[in-house]
Structures are given as structure tokens and as C-alpha cells.
């Protein structure tokens, strides 16, 4: 059995998230999803939806076998539980594949890291674009 790990914030679920998880799932038979903690997100605005609610939404997706929250202290801690064979990164995730693989190896993991290519194309395949659309609509209503 090949264990796959996908990670992300998953704030305001949209078709881009589903596409990422469906593509990640193709790399193995068991898909684990690590949902980022509110306190650890630094490379973009803090999520609108609280972490426990985001986790609940991800768990409800048919493509996902297991979902868990990340660690606030050590991003590698949940990997001890999951023991992934492959980590699949989305096109826009901030990690460098080789650098992450090296860090994993130094911690005793024999995990391959792959990055998906082109993102799913749709008008609102971005939490940021969804928020922007809501704000624009709200302004026109005022």
C-alpha cells in the first residue's frame, strides 16, 4: 500500500482543492491530508475559516481517507504518525521539493516529494479570488 500525503490550508474549499487532492490520490492507494494550523500560516493571510472547521470539511471529501491537523511546534511531527511514501505538493506551495526531501531524509524518512504541474483552471479556483468576488459584490450592493 502506498501512502500519499497532501498538505494545505484548504480555506474556503473550491474546485482547485478538489483537483489537487484527486491528482495526489493518483500516486497511491491511501490519501492522508494534513491541514495547516491557523498559527503556522505565515506565507499568506490568515484563514477565514477556523482550522477545526477546515479539517472537518476536508475529512468529508470522498477522495480523502484520513485528515489531520498539522503540528504547531514541528511540521514533521505528524509525519511520524502517517509515515508517507510520497508527499504531493500543489503548484503554489512554498516548499522546494529537493530541500524538503533532504530534510525528511535527515529525520529518517524515506519519502519521495513530487510537485503537481498546472493548476486546475476555473474562475474561482482560489480562496483569494472567492474573497475578492464577495467583497466586490458587497461594495456594489451598498
UniProtKB/Swiss-Prot annotation:
Gene3D superfamilies found in the cross-reference section: HUPs
Molecular function terms, GO-annotated: ATP binding; FMN adenylyltransferase activity
UniProt keyword annotations, A-Z: ATP-binding, FAD, Flavoprotein, FMN, Nucleotide-binding, Nucleotidyltransferase, Transferase
Entry's family note: Belongs to the archaeal FAD synthase family.
E.C. designation(s): 2.7.7.2
Catalytic activity: FMN + ATP + H(+) = FAD + diphosphate
Any Pfam family: CTP_transf_like
Protein name: FAD synthase
Broadest EC class assigned to this enzyme: transferase
Binding-site residues for ATP, renumbered to this chain: 9-10, 14-17, 92
UniProt-listed InterPro entries: Archaeal_FAD_synthase, Cyt_trans-like, FAD_synth_RibL, Rossmann-like_a/b/a_fold
Domain of life: Archaea
Known partners and oligomeric status: Homodimer.
Cofactor: a divalent metal cation
Pathway terms, separated by semicolons: Cofactor biosynthesis; FAD biosynthesis; FAD from FMN: step 1/1
Function (record text): Catalyzes the transfer of the AMP portion of ATP to flavin mononucleotide (FMN) to produce flavin adenine dinucleotide (FAD) coenzyme.
Amino acid at each position: 500500500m502506498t501512502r500519499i500525503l497532501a498538505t494545505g490550508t484548504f480555506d474556503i474549499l473550491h474546485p482547485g482543492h478538489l483537483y489537487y487532492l484527486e491528482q495526489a490520490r493518483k500516486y497511491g492507494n491511501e490519501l492522508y491530508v494534513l491541514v495547516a494550523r491557523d498559527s503556522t500560516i505565515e506565507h499568506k493571510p490568515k484563514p477565514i475559516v477556523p482550522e477545526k472547521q477546515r479539517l472537518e470539511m476536508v475529512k468529508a471529501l470522498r477522495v480523502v481517507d484520513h485528515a489531520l491537523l498539522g503540528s504547531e511546534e514541528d511540521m514533521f511531527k505528524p509525519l511520524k504518525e502517517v509515515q508517507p511514501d510520497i508527499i504531493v505538493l500543489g503548484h503554489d506551495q512554498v516548499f522546494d521539493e529537493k530541500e524538503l526531501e533532504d530534510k525528511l531524509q535527515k529525520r529518517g524518512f524515506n519519502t519521495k516529494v513530487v510537485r503537481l504541474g498546472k493548476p486546475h483552471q476555473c474562475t474561482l479556483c482560489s480562496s483569494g479570488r472567492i474573497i475578492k468576488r464577495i467583497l466586490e459584490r458587497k461594495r456594489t450592493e451598498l
